[in-house]
């Protein structure tokens, strides 16, 4: 009888209910907060990668027409010292500058080797587009792409998900200096 009476009094008692609610909800709220933080961090890194690829493509699309051996491929254009403008474009993508000294990477762990730059052509023999390189019917596009394996803070593992692999891509038509 006393056990039943004690159980009824505990059931009706509301002293300490806030402590119990807090103990139950705190882990759930911390997990939600951590997940929101992790996903926002991934989106932030993606925007940095997109900005880097965009900047690199724009830079190489405006590279001067100094082609060795009469080649008109902007991916093969070099400066007076013989350095490929493509190398400078990769540095701009990763560091935000043509020089790597004194500059930090936009995203930690992202290297110039992760950036791929190609210069595919498209046919302009019909003359529909302004010819920026005389003597050829091909127009060039500058395509910069990258892939980055995002190191996780651990919340993806809680959900049994693998960390995302962030990719970014930007394309510009080669227009030369101006």
PLM-predicted stretches and their roles:
Residues 1-15:
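N-terminal leader/signal peptides at the extreme start of proteins
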Residues 2-5, 47, 51-178:
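Short, conserved structural patches
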Residues 9-13, 22, 42:
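Membrane-interface junctions
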Residues 18, 22-37:
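Alpha-helical hydrophobic helix detector
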Residues 31-37, 41, 72-78:
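Short amphipathic alpha-helical segments at helix-loop
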Residues 38-50:
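Membrane-proximal amphipathic alpha-helices
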């Amino acid at each position: 009888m006393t056990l039943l009476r004690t159980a009824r009094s505990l059931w009706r008692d509301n002293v300490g209910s806030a402590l119990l609610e807090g103990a139950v909800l705190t882990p759930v709220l911390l997990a939600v907060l951590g997940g929101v933080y992790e996903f926002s961090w991934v989106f932030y890194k993606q925007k940095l990668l997109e900005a880097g690829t965009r900047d690199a493509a724009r830079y190489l699309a405006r590279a001067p027409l100094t082609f060795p051996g009469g080649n008109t491929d902007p991916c093969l254009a070099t400066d007076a010292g013989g350095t490929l403008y493509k190398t400078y474009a990769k540095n701009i993508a990763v560091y935000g500058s043509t020089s790597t000294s004194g500059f930090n990477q936009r995203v930690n762990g992202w290297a110039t080797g992760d950036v791929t730059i190609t210069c595919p052509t498209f046919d302009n023999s019909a003359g529909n587009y302004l010819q920026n390189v005389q003597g050829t019917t091909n127009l060039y596009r500058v395509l910069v792409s990258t892939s980055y394996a995002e190191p996780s803070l651990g919340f993806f593992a809680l959900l049994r998900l693998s960390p995302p692999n962030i990719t970014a891509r930007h394309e510009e038509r080669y227009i030369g200096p101006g």
